Amino acid sequence: MVDSTHSPEVERGIAALNELLGKEAAALLSPEKTRKDEVACFSFPIPADYTGTPRTLRIAFPRNFPLASLRLNVEPSPWLEWPHAMKSGLCLHGFREKPITGTPETVVHDSFSRFGTILNFVVEGSDRAMRDAEFHREITSYWNTQLGVSPQDLLLLERPKSGSELYATSDPRPSRRNQTAWLATSIESLRVHFRRIAGLSAKIRSPAVPGFYVKLQTFPGVRIPVADRLIDWLTPHLSPDDCKKFLAWFSGHGSLANRWIVLELPGPAGSPVYCLDVRSYSKQPDHGRWYGFRTARRWSGKNQPNHVPVLVRGAIINILDRNDILSRDLSGTAVELEKARVVMIGVGSLGSTIAQQLARSGIGEIVLIDPDMLESANLGRHVLGADDLGKWKAIALAEKITRDLPTVKAIPYVDYAEMLLISKPGLFENADLVIVTTADWSSEVALWRKKSAGTRWGLLQAWSEPHTLVGHTLLAPAGEFDARHLFDDSGNFNFRFTEWPKGDGVIAIPACGQSFIPGGASGMANVASMVVQTALRSLTAQLNEQAWISTIYRPQDAAARGGVYKGPLLEKGVQHIVLEREWPTPEGGDA
């Protein structure tokens, strides 16, 4: 059955297919007409499935086989009857899986191995519970293939604990007015989010209630019903209490053109959600609805008809819930950090990067202290951008963190740390960790003076050496600690790893007493990452003792930039290393 007109790879694939099936089964292969980009095709009868429907497996070798995988299709299509069967054919690979590459024999064997797994779920006499469980693992994919896509996406401002009505307002930004709707269980949540996004207070008096959030107790069927049968399809899978509330909401808001049903899939709290856009009145294309602050006054529900659904679509929904935002971090660190409070002194190029990473790690509250404005020269290595030029760094960064991560409380202060230690001591007394990255000796001295008297908060001082090839962190846990003896009277670290005899370490600028330490964004990222990891270990009680931590990246580059490296030698082939040890001794070496 090998055609010599085929490429050697296809011939090997066909031979592998015959060998895999065996002599008797291979005799059942029937040549079929090829389709676009196919060079060989066969049909093969397969055992009856649980529906009793006779089907045939279509096996096609694509033109660029084995770089392209074998094409397997079942006819007639078992879409919504077999797991992993789509309209276009069988889906042999799961989420983010790719077809393997290899020899023709390997590709044929892999494809049939995966097909055999699917067949085991559906052959006559197969276990229905196992088949249903396989459907449920990818249930939203099957629903998506049956539903159109709503023109409006949704932002759920928090995840409800139980079945709840959802108030709605539209995103006020012009580009999103009819594109995105905000949903929340309370009007106050909508007000807070509006203030966060628009920077204004909103008088949201009577918003529409077009949404309902409900937890599924069991899975509905994989096949979506016609629109007017949707409620019958859904309600058997709700708890009695949720079902009662849901039906009251659905009938009470039947005059709305669009209703949103947010389904939390069965499973533990925080399970994935799926949203249905239920449209009444018309199946005609629409462009999304505007939900204002008093929309509900237009739809009181009194003396208005309850329109049955005529169209059901899937809708994209995102959730601004802390657990959802941090769900990809499975280490458990975020749970421990929820109540952590960090005071960040200095939010320049290093401090801003640290603050942003801490916020994304799950810190509950972060206080940002910095007296400076953002300038154009800062943009190359700061997390803020051109729109923030001329703004106070602390305020602009707090706004960015709050806008990007609404579950984090960011509080800005445009002031000097040494002044706030006197005027607002509670800022520090209530902190778990204070991080200073100012490279300003006066603020560092003030903090170490306070720390030497004993504090409940830990202190982490971090800085980079010129050109960001080297960075350091000194960590002092709760208690009495003082690191002032490790620096000279000007605040220079006595145990630095680089020297800059040509004066290239600190660059003066034409202003009274002002200068900057040179370095790029990539080098600063190395230092920031080291500081963040140290801070997280301290906050989660993994590091409860004083430590000196250094990051070193390509120290040989110092010579090309006018410097001399005198720190620890790196082994051949090592480009980047992080060292951790006790504080250095005053005599000039590690403890």
Q: Language-model features: where?
A:
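N-terminal charged helix/coil linker that caps or initiates catalytic domains
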Residues: 282-342
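Glycine-rich phosphate-binding loop and adjoining beta1-alpha1-beta2 segment
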Residues: 371-406
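A short, aliphatic-rich alpha-helical micro-motif
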Residues: 337, 427-429
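Glycine-rich adenosine-cofactor-binding loop
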Residues: 333-373
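Glycine-rich phosphate/adenylate-binding loop
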Residues: 144-303, 429-433, 437-591
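Compact alpha/beta protein-protein interaction domains typified by the UBC
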Residues: 30-97, 105-109
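S-adenosyl-L-methionine
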Residues: 404-423
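Domain-level detector for trafficking modules
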Residues: 84-143
